[in-house]
Amino acid sequence: MIQSQISQNARLALSEVILLAKARKDLSFAQITEGTGLSEAFVTAALLGQHPLPASAAQVVGDKLGLDADGIALLQTIPLRGSIQGGVPTDPTIYRFYEMLQVYGTTLKALVHEKFGDGIISAINFKLDVKKVDDPEGGSRAVITLDGKYLPTKPF
């Protein structure tokens, strides 16, 4: 039976256990994801308490990380989502995304509405991908793809 969380506490505690096991076993999120049939971004979000995993994926992940039956079951619960608490984020990496939306948020909104009409980009019917590519000027660049279904506003 599908279960749901009413607070973030249990999933946050499990995330701490998961991250310790990941470090202890020297695993990457990509390695943990292998065999689940899901994307690295989705599994990572689930491990950080933002999505439930299907039973088969939870078992694969749990086996790799050495989670007990309760941990594997908890990975399958629907979490109370939202990982950034307390307003403006203080972590530098997360803050840069916040900053990008502060600078480009209204631009994104204007372009989405101009190209699609009044509506939103779904974060439910959604795909996320992060790639590291070489920068022709030296170093590396991050290519982050946000791929969400457009949902038009419907008058009622």
From Swiss-Prot:
SUPFAM superfamilies: Cyanase C-terminal domain, lambda repressor-like DNA-binding domains. The active site is at residues 96, 99, 122. CDD domains: Cyanase_C. This is Cyanate hydratase. It comes from the Bacteria. Its EC number is 4.2.1.104. It catalyses: cyanate + hydrogencarbonate + 3 H(+) = NH4(+) + 2 CO2. GO terms for biological process: cyanate metabolic process. Belongs to the cyanase family. It holds the Pfam family Cyanate_lyase. The gene is cynS. It is an enzyme of class 4 (lyase). Catalyzes the reaction of cyanate with bicarbonate to produce ammonia and carbon dioxide. Keywords: Lyase. GO terms for molecular function: cyanate hydratase activity; DNA binding. It comes from Pseudomonas entomophila (strain L48). Gene3D superfamilies: Cyanate lyase, C-terminal domain, lambda repressor-like DNA-binding domains.
